Amino acid sequence: MSNPAGSFIWYELMTTDANAAARFYGAVVGWQIADRPDPQAGGKDYRHITRDDGGSGGGVLQITKDMHEQGAHPAWIAYLYVSDVDRALRAITADGGRALMPKMTLPVGDIAMVADPMGAPFYVMTPVQPPGQPDAVSDVFSVDKPQHVRWNELRSPDLARATAFYARHFGFQCNESMPMGPQLGDYRFIDHGGLRVGGMMKQADVAGPGGWTFYFGGRSASAAKRAIEANGGTVTMDLHQVPGGDWVVSATDPQGARFGVVGPKGE
């Protein structure tokens, strides 16, 4: 990919019911999710998410019995671009992170699942350019478009260490912040590649579990909330306005994966 090193280049839902996930996210975000596995996925139940504009919104992986027994649970997970997965693994583990899954070489590139020093999981990936597209760029993230991931948020028990870790390995810059009160401290904005791509905050019991949460662009946050509740999801934080004027609702899907929707309040 021609994205800057450290970019968010893919998002994946691990779920116990891919068909139910397709119905839910179709209603809430408007995505189309394939009704059968990708035949090139090597026997795994892996399905692609398609946006209304024909672009890709990420993927859906059905959790198998073996994966569940090894600790997999419904969750969204991000892929960060690195130029060399082996080198990234060495650097991350030397800096207190962990390798959760060894490097795998797939038709789309090299991947490995890792965790930061506080335990938040994510993938590192060195992608293979699509045939005939040497300058292809991943556009699953956008700061303002519906049906893209618009915000990447990390809750961490050690905010200072997380800030330094992601700066060293992925070039995240957290130079601006806003106060969140005495219990949560500052909310640190993440800038990368000239864009404001997300934020970091202190993990606290009242703020829910730690790790990464991803916020999908919606055309109406109010409509997204209604769709979440009507389709078996659970709203974990009600509609609220955020800096810049957009509105956000946080939720879990029917299988328990955490996510949010951000956009105009709408009707």
Where is each model-derived feature located?
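Ligand-binding pocket scaffold of soluble enzyme catalytic domains
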Residues: 12, 20-22, 29, 34-35, ...
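N-terminal beta-strand motif that seeds the catalytic metal site of vicinal oxygen chelate
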Residues: 1-22, 75-78, 125-163, 175, ...
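Vicinal oxygen chelate
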Residues: 2-4, 7-16, 47-50, 66-91, 93-146, 175-195, ...
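Conserved donor-binding loop and adjoining core beta-sheet/short helix segment
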Residues: 35-37, 52, 59-69
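Core segments of cupin and vicinal oxygen chelate
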Residues: 2-55, 94, 102-109, 154-195, ...
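Generic "edge-of-domain/loop-turn" microfeature
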Residues: 18-20, 40, 54, 67, ...
